[in-house]
Amino acid sequence: GMNVGYWNGKTLETPLPSLGFILGDEASGADIGKRLVRGVFEKRLPQSLIDAFFASYPISLQELLDKVYKQSCPNAFLAQFAPFVIAHKNESAMQEIINEAFSDLFTYYINPLRKTYKTQKISFVGSIAHALSEYIVLKTQNEKCSLEKIISRPLDFLERKDCSAKY
């Protein structure tokens, strides 16, 4: 999933709701996977990428629709395709998917938050952010943000902090 918040030094403020993978979750694994399968099944990607996709994921349109609309955890199902985009991120069609996902994330979530809280500092957490860090670096430069950090796993970050507080 995806969420955006502002750390005020004591608590995390989340003024914009996460709308989930159907209505939102821009730049999440599910979002990137959804963008990929649309490109594959709508034949908007180069044939070489479509062939590579089906070699990795031999799935029919009917199976795809069943998994997305009739079975549990469709977001996790769609997120399983994000590694394909990451593995082929040097292909222009995959770069377009990635850039569109991050552009939407900034347009709908990050830029409104920056405006509300008058901040240019930004950090990212998660495996997708880590795997696509070079795209985040470029996007934050283009948006004139100060990229503070990209953390692959939140627990790794917390383990480095003093977590001796009693809860």
Residue ranges and their predicted role:
Residues 1, 18-19, 127:
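Fold-independent oxyanion-binding glycine-rich loops
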